[in-house]
Design a protein with these regions (language model features):
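Serine-esterase "nucleophile elbow" of acetyl-processing enzymes
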Residues: 2-72, 85-94
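Internal alpha/beta domain cores that form substrate/cofactor-binding pockets in large enzymes
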Residues: 26-28, 59, 64-93, 105-135
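Solvent-exposed loop/turn segments at secondary-structure junctions
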Residues: 33-36, 75-79, 104-109, 138-142, ...
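Short, solvent-exposed loop/turn segments at secondary-structure boundaries
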Residues: 39-45, 109-113, 145-149
Length: 217
């Protein structure tokens, strides 16, 4: 079962504690160019990308918490490569929460290889009592073409939803958020900064999806 909005309750209780009894909380965003902050490649717009937007949202809700949002994402990377460096680059930060976002690039390594890599990272995290939130993909120009790339993106979206359900972890359904908002405004271009990267508005949709797990105390 996909975890609901109370998934992080015990951590949120700790985040409401004031100095001198509070502690450092680490949230790690692991993935590809989107959490890295790439807009029109090679331009990296760190402060309009969803890890930073999420950080600001969390601090507004938890003003006494010492929270680090750490980005270990790498442009152009897929999940098998992300899994290869997972222990060295991610687990060394001792995350309380891990956010994984690889679907856009995983289309080109295939569903089976992608699933194996996501499962490896999920299992390694759960073994260490790390809370995990999986992200479905943001949309890109393949939406306009409804081509094979789009069909693959839909398949990877479904696979990530299945993984969140199977491992009983959190889900930030960016794909569904895009679907809702594009239908409302009838304009995907508002949420794109490049052919395959979100604009600030697109990143905000992802940040809001993740932030639903960080309910103010």
């Amino acid at each position: 079962m996909i975890q609901g909005i109370h998934y992080l309750d015990s951590l949120l209780d700790e985040m409401a504690v004031k100095w001198p009894d509070n502690r450092i909380v680490n949230i790690v965003c692991h993935g590809h160019s989107v959490p890295s902050g790439y807009f029109a490649t090679p331009f990296v717009n760190t402060f309009d990308a969803y890890p930073h937007l999420l950080h600001k949202m969390i601090k507004e809700r938890f003003p006494f918490a010492v929270v680090n949002v750490i980005v270990t994402a790498k442009g152009g990377e897929n999940s098998p490569h992300g899994a290869d460096r997972f222990e060295k680059d991610v687990l060394t930060h001792n995350p309380d929460v891990l956010i994984i976002d690889y679907c856009l690039n995983d289309r080109f390594c295939g569903l089976a290889a992608s699933r194996m890599a996501w499962e490896q990272m999920i299992k390694q995290s759960l073994e260490r009592d790390i809370k995990v939130i999986l992200c479905t993909p943001t949309w890109e120009k393949a939406y306009f073409e409804q081509n094979e790339n789009w069909k693959m993106l839909v398949q990877h979206t479904e696979q990530v939803r299945e993984l969140a359900d199977y491992y009983s972890v959190g889900l930030a359904d960016s794909f569904a958020a895009y679907e809702r908002h594009v239908k409302d405004v009838m304009d995907l271009s508002k949420y794109l900064s490049h052919v395959n990267h979100p604009s600030r508005e697109g990143h905000m949709l992802v940040a809001q999806e993740i932030a639903k797990y960080f309910i103010a105390r």
